[in-house]
Structures are given as C-alpha cells and as structure tokens.
Amino acid sequence: MYAKVYQYKFPGISEAKVAAAYCSDKLGQKIDEHNFHGLGILISQEGDLTIWIKFDDVAKLKAFNKDADQFVHDLKTSFVFKENKYVGIYVYNY
C-alpha cells in the first residue's frame, strides 16, 4: 500500500475548512480516474489540513502525480498556507 500525503498549515480553522471543501471536491473527482484505494481529509483546531490518498501500487501513485501538480498549483493560487508533502509506504495500517 502506498500513500501520497499533503500537510498544510493555514492561518486559522476557518481557512482550513474552506480549503478542505475545495480539496474534497477536486480530489473526489479523481477517485475513479486514478482508482484511489482511500482518501482522507482531516482538519485540526489550529488550522492544519492533512490529506492522504492511498494507492494499491506504485504505478497508480505515479500516474496520479501528473494531476497532483495541477491540484497543488490551483490550491496555491487560491489560498495562503505553508506546505509539507511526502510519499510514504504503509508500514502498519488497521
């Protein structure tokens, strides 16, 4: 199992809520196209937004990366935030 994880820090929870709705819409449209195994979007009270997208194999993750660049670009032109992203392999998942 592979995952693409985005971590964003917004000025406050209000901005994170708006961004979460935007991300839910944009990424939700990509579920069938890229055959996501899972999609999770979390918000903290401090304005953190975490998005994880699970893939069954690395080929699907690499195929999504092409669309991911446009998604991140659109997000950056619409919102102010700090970004941390990485690709990981699930070591343990229940």
Q: Which functions belong to the PLM regions below?
A:
Residues 1-49, 54-67, 83-94:
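Short S/T/G/P-rich N-terminal loop/turn motif that feeds into the first structured element of a domain
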Residues 71-85:
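C-terminal structural segments of small proteins and small subunits
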